């Protein structure tokens, strides 16, 4: 009979049960909240508290990746990282540090908006209800957050400062010579003072207001661009590259995504490519995460090469040049044609009205004119995903645009094609095709019967087509033009080619990035409005700070206009654009009342999470987004060369590129502009693993309730029906969700916390086993029984010394636990506490000198029962700020040492000698122990390895 099923009379009145755990936990949670136990004092301002027990102490800022409050609430996998950081933060408070640990909510985004569209319920209503549910669930777990610092990105007093940060970025430009952002006003001063040339060389005073504005806007870190974007008709919005899956579909909804040229807000994150890459070396992050960011940034060294063009009968003025970037400029002698992305800006300029004489029919796409060929091909290409366009296995397609370019090193006229395997968003959107050294170019050349020139000597025995390896340059000389690469290795050939290009004005050495500028606008409702209006000329104007926040207005229809998922030619229509009384506004921006039009896009969900860690530091400040002194105290650099940032940031590895890269970019801009002292937001990153679960399917493949499945002899059954077991994530659709609420009801929050922390290393994924939770419950019951008499409720703790063996065990455990806690090895900590508890329960009475350290070491994991036991042992204040136990070094030294004794390589005995015994004493004891094995023989050699073993050679 289980305890839960046993008659109440059979259970001792003061036994630790789920009901008692619930009463204890709720009482202590109320106490902590009432007394502000986990409030962390700031150095100054309204959150300062000079009387706090940790005022002036060494600080520690522990941060969780804050959750999106979904309607489903938490399952047991979600709190794993939150419990881990709570255990770490609780330990650090007891170790003497002033710990800031807060929790907020990343609450804007598409799920709430989609739910609003389906139900008509305002997204704020559902989101606030979800936040309330999350708060209740997290509170039930006993998480020690400073609730005064909680924020939600949907609150106007929070997104006011999100808008303010956007304006700092908008009103800044990146000075590549200084390698930092500077205010736009300083750029204008350089233009007007003549120290910086305008793009066309005219004096600043000769430019019209519109021309000046255009020049300045080209430098802004936040700017509007008519650019190729990921348009998703099925969602009715554009998406960032990072929100598109590898197969070219939307991450949310799985709709097809198309490349379209649309007017959108962008952020010039590419300006920070080098710093984002180089500063990874200063971060204490997992190496796989750093590698993912390095690959995403994708720095490449090579050259930009300019190819002059000629376009008979086209509308082109002069000779437009096509710029390509290549990592192998040394292969330019093999460039026999150019390929542009169908969306490339120069295509329309270069297309003539008629085909040149002698154009092969295969090049024309069967069309009567270049313009018809280009239009037809573009339509087909727009319907393909990026993955489909770049598939290695597909047959190469394309059309000749009717114009030629000049290869600068050979002088040869080479045809210009458009083809879908070149993407506008990567590089310059144009490539020089070298079929001899590139497999895709070779395949294209074969389809269109284009020349193939090898410029690298293939390895001996090579019988393939394109040779992509290294080798000496061949067919790479035009002496009359002053360039001869034949016989050179790749590195020298590249260097010589770049020098020749730069000397002749044909190109230059360059570094490029896979990283693209960040698409920052969304055609949605549920997001931060932009603090931007447009005047009668369509010029963007930043609103002054005193007009912030620009609040999100009420609307009748929350949905952006969506389209047939395959309608690539559709155009965005935003929900805010339908609130004309909000869109069209009269404002006085310093030159009298005028009519303006508001920006009707909203910011992406990532905006609030780019800076929320700063608002936790000073959440009530109405004058600044964060007080500089608070930022320096909690996030400032520790010394010369230190990057600063949070001391610990815990979250899932799935955010390796998106959130982490965007947040680093925003933080660096704020650092450049003098708003923060740290140049990285997160000094140390820790990725927790995932809690996964078994799911079960019947013969139809339908999921069945996991809790109703039983195992019999290694086979799984639902009733009498055999089912299949699979392992993976936990989810409602898989019918295997277990919630923290269920576990707290069955065992208490402390048991749930101990179980999650004991399942394995925090960074490793692990399977959830509901049946195993009872083991953690029984452990806490043993701790309780060691200290509390289950019949009377009286304390069993006595003020008598522990025996020597128990005392030495205690200090060994304390020493090990401290090391484990610092390294976040929580599972091994709990194993040590179980070992100590088992030893304690074998004693006839419980010595205080063992019980109190045990409870203090247990407190980070099971804080409620630890507080209760601490109080029952006679303490009147919370153990939150009690000193964590420290081991006595003298008790860590063993009194005796056990030596295995080998004879001719086999262990024949063991001896125990005093720890300070000399070698002769050890030798004599060893020989005595194996005398029978020696059978009277005199050993030839006796080797004593101090503290480890004795080896006897007979």
UniProtKB/Swiss-Prot annotation:
Its EC number is 6.1.1.4. A motif ('KMSKS' region) lies at residues 729-733. It catalyses: tRNA(Leu) + L-leucine + ATP = L-leucyl-tRNA(Leu) + AMP + diphosphate. ATP binds at residue 732. GO terms for cellular component: cytosol. GO terms for molecular function: aminoacyl-tRNA deacylase activity; ATP binding; leucine-tRNA ligase activity. GO terms for biological process: leucyl-tRNA aminoacylation. Keywords: Aminoacyl-tRNA synthetase, ATP-binding, Cytoplasm, Ligase, Nucleotide-binding, Protein biosynthesis. It comes from the Bacteria. A motif ('HIGH' region) lies at residues 67-78. It is found in: Cytoplasm. It holds the Pfam family tRNA-synt_1g. Its main location: cytoplasm. Belongs to the class-I aminoacyl-tRNA synthetase family. This is Leucine--tRNA ligase. The gene is leuS.
């Amino acid at each position: 009979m289980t305890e839960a099923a046993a008659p109440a009379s059979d259970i001792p009145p003061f036994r630790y049960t789920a009901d008692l755990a619930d009463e204890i936990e709720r009482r202590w949670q109320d106490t902590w909240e009432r007394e502000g136990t986990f409030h962390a004092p700031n150095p100054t301002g309204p959150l300062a508290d000079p009387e706090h027990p940790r005022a002036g102490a060494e600080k520690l800022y522990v941060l969780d990746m804050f959750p999106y409050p979904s309607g489903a609430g938490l399952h047991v996998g979600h709190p794993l990282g939150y419990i881990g950081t709570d255990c770490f933060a609780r330990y650090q408070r007891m170790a003497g540090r002033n710990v800031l640990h807060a929790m907020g909510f990343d609450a804007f985004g598409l799920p709430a908006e989609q739910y609003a569209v389906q139900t008509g319920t305002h997204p704020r209503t559902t989101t606030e209800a979800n936040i309330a549910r999350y708060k209740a669930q997290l509170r039930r777990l006993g998480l020690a957050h400073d609730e005064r610092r909680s924020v939600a990105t949907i609150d106007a007093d929070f997104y006011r400062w999100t808008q303010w940060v956007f304006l700092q970025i908008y009103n800044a430009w990146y000075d590549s010579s200084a390698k930092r952002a500077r205010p736009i006003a300083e750029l204008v001063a350089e233009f007007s003072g003549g120290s910086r040339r305008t793009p066309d060389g005219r004096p600043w005073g000769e430019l019209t207001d519109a021309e000046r504005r255009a020049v300045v806007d080209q430098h802004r870190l936040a700017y509007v661009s008519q650019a190729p974007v990921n348009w998703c008709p099925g969602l009715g919005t554009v998406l960032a590259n990072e929100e598109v899956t590898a197969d070219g579909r939307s991450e949310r909804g799985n709709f097809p995504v198309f490349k379209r040229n649309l007017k959108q807000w962008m952020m010039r994150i590419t300006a920070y490519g080098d710093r984002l890459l180089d500063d990874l070396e200063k971060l204490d992050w997992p190496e796989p995460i750093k590698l993912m960011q390095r690959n995403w940034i994708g720095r490449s060294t090579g050259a930009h090469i300019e190819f002059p063009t000629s376009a008979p009968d086209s509308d082109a003025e002069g000779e437009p040049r096509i710029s390509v970037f290549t990592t192998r400029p040394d292969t330019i002698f093999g460039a026999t044609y150019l390929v542009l992305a169908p969306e490339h800006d120069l295509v329309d300029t270069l297309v003539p009205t008629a085909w040149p004489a002698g154009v092969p029919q295969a090049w024309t796409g069967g069309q009567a004119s270049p313009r018809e060929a280009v239009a037809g091909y573009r339509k087909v290409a727009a319907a393909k995903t990026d993955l489909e366009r770049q598939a290695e296995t597909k047959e190469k397609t394309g059309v000749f645009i009717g114009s030629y370019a000049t290869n600068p090193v050979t002088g040869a006229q080479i045809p210009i094609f458009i083809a879908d395997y070149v993407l506008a968003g990567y590089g310059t959107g144009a490539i020089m095709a070298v079929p001899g050294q590139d497999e895709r170019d070779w395949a294209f050349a074969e389809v269109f019967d284009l020349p193939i020139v090898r410029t690298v000597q293939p390895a001996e025995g090579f019988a393939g087509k394109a040779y992509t390896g290294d080798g000496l340059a061949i067919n790479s000389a035009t002496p009359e033009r002053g360039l001869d690469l034949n016989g050179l290795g790749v590195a020298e050939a590249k260097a010589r080619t770049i020098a020749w290009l730069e000397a002749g004005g044909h190109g230059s050495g360059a570094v490029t990035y896979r990283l693209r500028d960040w698409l920052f606008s969304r055609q949605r409702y549920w997001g931060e409005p932009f603090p931007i209006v447009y005047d009668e000329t369509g010029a963007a104007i930043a609103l002054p700070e005193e007009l912030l926040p620009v609040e999100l207005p009420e609307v009748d229809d929350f949905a952006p206009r969506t389209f047939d998922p395959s309608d690539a030619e559709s155009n965005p229509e935003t929900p805010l654009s339908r609130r004309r009384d909000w869109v069209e506004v009269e404002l006085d921006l310093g030159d009298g009342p005028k009519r303006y039009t508001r920006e009707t896009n909203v910011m992406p969900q990532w905006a609030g999470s780019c800076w929320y860690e700063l608002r936790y530091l000073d959440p009530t400040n109405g004058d600044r987004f964060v007080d500089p002194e608070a930022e320096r105290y909690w996030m400032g650099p520790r010394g010369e060369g230190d990057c600063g940032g949070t001391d610990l940031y815990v979250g899932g590895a799935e955010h390796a590129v998106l959130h982490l890269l965007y947040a680093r970019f925003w933080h660096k801009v704020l650092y450049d502009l003098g708003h923060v002292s740290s140049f990285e937001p997160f000094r140390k990153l820790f990725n927790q693993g995932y809690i996964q679960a078994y799911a079960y399917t019947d013969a139809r493949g339908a999921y069945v309730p996991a809790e109703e499945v039983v195992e019999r002899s290694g086979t799984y059954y639902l009733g009498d029906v055999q089912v299949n077991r699979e392992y993976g994530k936990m989810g409602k659709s898989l019918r295997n969700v277990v919630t923290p609420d269920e576990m707290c009801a069955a065992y208490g929050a402390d048991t749930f916390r101990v179980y999650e922390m004991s399942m394995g290393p925090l960074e490793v994924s692990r399977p959830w086993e509901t049946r195993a939770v009872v083991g953690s419950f029984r452990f806490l019951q043993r701790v309780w029984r060691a200290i509390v008499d289950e019949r009377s409720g009286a304390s069993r703790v006595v003020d008598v010394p522990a025996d020597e063996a128990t005392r030495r065990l205690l200090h060994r455990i304390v020493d090990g636990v401290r090391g484990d806690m610092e390294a976040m090895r929580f599972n091994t900590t709990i194993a040590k506490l179980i070992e100590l508890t088992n030893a304690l329960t074998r004693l006839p009475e419980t010595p205080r000198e063992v019980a109190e350290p045990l409870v203090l070491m247990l407190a980070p994991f099971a804080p409620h029962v630890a507080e209760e036991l601490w109080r029952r042992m006679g303490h009147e204040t919370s153990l939150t700020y009690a000193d964590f136990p420290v081991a006595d070094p003298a008790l860590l030294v063993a009194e005796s040492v056990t030596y295995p004794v080998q004879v001719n390589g086999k262990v024949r005995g063991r001896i125990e000698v005093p720890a300070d015994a000399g070698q002769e004493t050890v030798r004599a004891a060893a020989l005595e122990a194996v005398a029978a094995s020696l059978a009277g023989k005199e050993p030839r050699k006796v080797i004593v390895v101090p503290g480890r073993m004795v080896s006897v050679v007979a």
